[in-house]
């Protein structure tokens, strides 16, 4: 006589559980200057007439720095970019670097 086959259904199969691997994300470091404080700027300070502050937000070529360099949150970065664009239209900031 033939012996009955063993129960080979998948319902009896137990899968080995893997341990979850958690990625370690490094903290943001201040790339511009290490002594600079990371305090948020109020909306009133970010203004198109505040050229000294706006010059810190653009490169030597006149491009706007991204958030990872300015260390501003999303709302402050939007205010900063709008203020830079307004200052360019008024003529307080250059659009591009002057060529020699």
UniProtKB/Swiss-Prot annotation:
GO terms for molecular function: small ribosomal subunit rRNA binding; structural constituent of ribosome. Keywords: Chloroplast, Plastid, Ribonucleoprotein, Ribosomal protein, RNA-binding, rRNA-binding. The keyword Transmembrane helix does not apply. Part of the 30S ribosomal subunit. It is found in: Plastid, Chloroplast. Pfam families: Ribosomal_S18. One of its GO terms (cellular component) is chloroplast. Its main location: plastid. HAMAP family: Ribosomal_bS18. The lineage of its organism: Eukaryota, Viridiplantae, Chlorophyta, core chlorophytes, Chlorophyceae. NCBIfam families: S18 (TIGR00165). The keyword Chloroplast applies. InterPro entries: Ribosomal_bS18, Ribosomal_bS18_sf. Belongs to the bacterial ribosomal protein bS18 family. Signal peptide: none annotated. This is Small ribosomal subunit protein bS18c. GO terms for biological process: translation.
């Amino acid at each position: 006589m033939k012996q009955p086959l063993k129960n080979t259904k998948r319902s009896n199969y137990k899968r080995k559980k893997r341990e979850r691997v958690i990625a370690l994300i490094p903290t943001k470091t201040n790339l511009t200057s290490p002594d600079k404080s990371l305090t948020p700027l109020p909306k009133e300070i970010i203004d198109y007439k505040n050229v000294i502050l706006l010059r810190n937000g653009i490169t030597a070529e006149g491009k706007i720095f991204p958030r990872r360099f300015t260390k501003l949150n999303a709302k402050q970065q939007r205010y900063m970019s709008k203020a830079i664009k307004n200052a360019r239209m008024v003529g307080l900031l250059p659009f591009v670097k002057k060529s020699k």
